[in-house]
Amino acid sequence: SGSCTTKTCWTTLPKFREIGYILKEKYNAAVQVEVVRASRLRQPTFLKIKQIRSYQKPMETDLVYIDKSPNYCEEDASTGSVGTQGRLCNRTSLSADGCDMMCCGRGYNTHQYTKVWQCNCKF
């Protein structure tokens, strides 16, 4: 009875879009932390959640940050960011040059220009 059964197992990654959704959720729930340098008894340096009277450490699965990201929509001379105010945008684009994205949801003004010139046409 020379019967043989072969079983092959493998693991696969989730779809790229699923990973993107998970990362976006983690980004939206990111926790600001601060570095605590312990000096007593040679304890190691660690991170704790940055809140008043909080001594809680972040979970290993938390996405953490130390400094808040600058708001690139607003002008900030200290970082050299000119912001987006007054910039031209593409009203129909869904990309980074689109008005909805570039103006950070604050709305935008549209202008229509008419130019009249002499074309020197001969009939």
From Swiss-Prot:
Keywords on record: Developmental protein, Disulfide bond, Extracellular matrix, Glycoprotein, Lipoprotein, Secreted, Wnt signaling pathway
Residues covered by region (Disordered linker): 33-61
Post-translational events: Palmitoleoylation is required for efficient binding to frizzled receptors. Depalmitoleoylation leads to Wnt signaling pathway inhibition.
Residues glycosylated per entry: N90
SMART domains per record: WNT1
Localization per Swiss-Prot or TrEMBL: Secreted, Extracellular space, Extracellular matrix; Secreted
Paired cysteines (S-S): C89-C104
Predominant location category: secreted
GO cellular component terms listed in the entry, alphabetical order: extracellular space
Residue numbers with lipid attached (O-palmitoleoyl serine): S1
GO BP: animal organ development; canonical Wnt signaling pathway; cell fate commitment; neuron differentiation; positive regulation of JNK cascade
Protein's name according to its UniProt entry: Protein Wnt-7b
Gene name of the record: WNT-7B
